[in-house]
Amino acid sequence: MKRKNNKFIEISIAFILGVALGIYGQNPDYFTNLINQKSLASSAPKIKHYNISELLRSKVSTCFTPPAGCTKFIANQIDRAEESIYMQAYGMSDALITTALINAQMRGVKVRILLDRSNLKQKFSKLHELQRAKIDVGIDKVPGIAHNKVIIIDRKKVITGSFNFTAAADKRNAENVIIIEDRELAESYLQNWLNRKASN
């Protein structure tokens, strides 16, 4: 009986090792990514609560597509920046927003951008154009996708929503943009930006 149990254990170990080696052979990064994902999942999310009555005293603006026009709405906000712009973006291919960011950099505004890694290969991404303009552009190497769509202006204004910074978001998709002018909220978003930057 003991010999049979030992044989069963040996077969089980061999089977598990076989599966593990098979997975590793097809995708050497599988276990590294799995560990990274588990470590991300195990760390508690940073949840911050806001008193709605306080936020209601903030200036809030919205924009929806269709019809087109949210790109110009966002670019106008960038044009008003005086000190700093921190951006997180999944898609970054819109010419008008790119021009507004470059112009901001040229007039002395500190512009810092974090993009999803897909921009390294996307044909229409403005990544290299932004870098040529001497803008600090980093890649967020989160195991999944960096799906944020956030712009923090002068540490007091947050632009966010479903809107990717692409022509498709403005002209083809149904999207939303919200702008909230609130220093405490902006600092919370900025801290997340800095945390993502530090982790890369």
Curated annotation (Swiss-Prot):
> Membrane-spanning regions, if any?
none
Cited CDD domains: PLDc_Nuc
Where does the PLD phosphodiesterase domain lie?
142-169
GO cellular component terms listed in the entry, alphabetical order:
extracellular region
Q: One Pfam annotation, family name?
A: PLDc_2
Gene Ontology biological process: lipid catabolic process; phosphorus metabolic process
Enzyme Commission code:
3.1.4.4
Is rRNA processing found in the keyword set?
no
Keywords for the protein's UniProt record, in alphabetical order? Hydrolase, Lipid degradation, Lipid metabolism, Secreted, Signal, Virulence
Q: Could you tell me one molecular function GO term of this UniProt entry?
A: phospholipase D activity
> Which range is the signal sequence, renumbered to this chain?
1-25
Coiled-coil stretches noted in the UniProt entry, renumbered to this chain: none
Q: Could you name the domain of life of the organism this protein comes from?
A: Bacteria
Q: Which reaction does it catalyse?
A: a 1,2-diacyl-sn-glycero-3-phosphocholine + H2O = a 1,2-diacyl-sn-glycero-3-phosphate + choline + H(+)
Q: Where is the active site?
A: H147, K149, D154
User: Where is this chain primarily localised?
Assistant: secreted
Compartment list: Secreted
Entry's family note:
Belongs to the phospholipase D family.
Report the protein's function. Answer: Could be a virulence factor.
The record describes its quaternary structure and partners as: Homodimer.
Q: What is this protein called?
A: Phospholipase D
Task: Tell me which species this is from.
Answer: Rickettsia felis (strain ATCC VR-1525 / URRWXCal2) (Rickettsia azadi)
